[in-house]
Design a protein with these regions (language model features):
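Conserved phosphate/ATP/ADP-binding segment of small-molecule kinases
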Residues: 157-251
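Glycine-rich phosphate/adenosyl-contacting loop at the front of the ribokinase-like
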Residues: 2-68, 77-78, 255
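Short beta-strand scaffold segments in enzyme catalytic cores
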Residues: 56, 103-105, 242-245
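Short beta-strands and strand-loop turn motifs
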Residues: 115-117, 142-150, 180, 198-203
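Short, conserved phosphate/pyrophosphate- and ester-handling motifs at nucleotide-, phospho-/glycolipid
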Residues: 58, 200, 268
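Hydrophobic anchor at the start of a short beta-strand
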Residues: 14, 64-66, 90, 177, ...
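Conserved phosphate-binding/catalytic region of the ribokinase-like
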Residues: 187, 215-298
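Conserved N-terminal subdomain of the carbohydrate kinase-like
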Residues: 36, 60-144
Length: 298
């Protein structure tokens, strides 16, 4: 079956798009060793993928959010069921390929996480075009469009840029586009221009071609993206060292929050979810930054 689209009169403050969703499977074992048969704990299943994780956080915070994503096969059905159990509003574009799985194994003796990420299904042009069409045909454009996660095989690297252009055209420029992706997809999205981008330090180094060894250089590199019209806000993720929020006229630094780490998986998505939820309530960027940091540490 080719990608399908079912339009419903949905109004939402925040629309998330996840082109490569996943059924996240997590477990733990005492020690990870090659060639050995490892006895693991019972698996935990969660709906996954960048935008889906963002939507789950927004929903838990009481925000108005809709998650849109392509879905296929038995794995896709299970992912949908898990979202329904959480009562997260969502819309699926049905595709022929099987939704991927991602695996996380925690080594309980050391606290290390081992993550295994599959590429995702091959999507054909009518399927990914249906995703563009859904966003462009919404009766009321969202205030925020969050495009997060990787792109599966078959989807062009400029998809995020195309999606941003569709959203801007439909909303006459009022929708704020937020992008959290990497590689060529990130470059193309920034060339189109977005409201907010959340790169990691490694991604910012790749974007600027600089080593960026100090906070001053981090800030200057982020401001370079802003001055070139690629983004209005840069939320630089620094991992356990916190984050840096940069606009044309201010820079805010937050140190990492000291918490007992149960799992680092999804922390970046939680940061985005908390921040965009706060921005949907108020345009106070400093307050939104605080919410993002708190959500990422939770």
């Amino acid at each position: 079956m080719e990608g399908t689209i079912t339009l419903t009169p949905i109004m939402t403050d925040i629309l998330t798009v996840t082109m490569n969703p996943a059924l996240d499977v997590s477990t733990s074992t005492d020690r990870v060793m090659d060639t050995h048969k490892l006895r693991c704990t019972a698996a935990n299943l969660h709906p996954g993928g960048g935008g889906i994780n963002v939507a789950r956080v927004v929903h838990r915070l009481g925000g108005d959010c809709l998650a849109m994503f392509p879905v296929g096969g038995v794995t896709g059905q299970l992912l949908q069921q898990l979202l329904m159990e959480e009562q997260v509003p969502h819309h699926c574009i049905h595709i022929v390929g099987e939704t991927r799985e991602s695996f996380s194994v925690r080594e309980s003796s050391t606290g290390r996480d081992f993550r295994f990420v599959l590429p995702g299904p091959d999507m054909v042009q009518p399927e990914w075009e249906a995703c563009l069409a859904y966003v462009g045909a919404l009766p009321t454009p969202p205030r925020y469009l969050v495009v997060s996660g990787s792109l599966p095989p078959g989807v062009p690297t400029d998809f995020c840029a195309r999606l941003a252009e569709v959203a801007q055209a439909a909303s006459k420029g009022s929708t704020r586009v937020v992008v959290d992706t990497s590689g060529a997809a990130l470059v193309a999205a920034l060339d189109a221009g977005v409201y907010l981008v959340k790169p990691s330090l490694r991604e910012l180094r790749d974007l600027t071609g600089r080593t960026l060894t100090s906070e001053t250089e981090w800030r200057e590199a982020a401001q370079q993206l802003i001055h070139e019209g690629q983004a209005q806000v840069v939320a630089l993720s620094l991992g356990e060292d916190g984050a840096l929020l940069v606009t044309a006229d201010q820079a805010l630094r937050a140190k990492g929050v000291a918490v007992k780490v149960a799992s680092s998986i999804g922390a970046g998505d939680s940061f985005v979810g908390g921040m965009i939820w706060a921005l949907s309530q108020s345009d106070d960027l400093e307050q939104a930054f605080r919410y993002g940091m708190a959500s990422g540490a939770a």
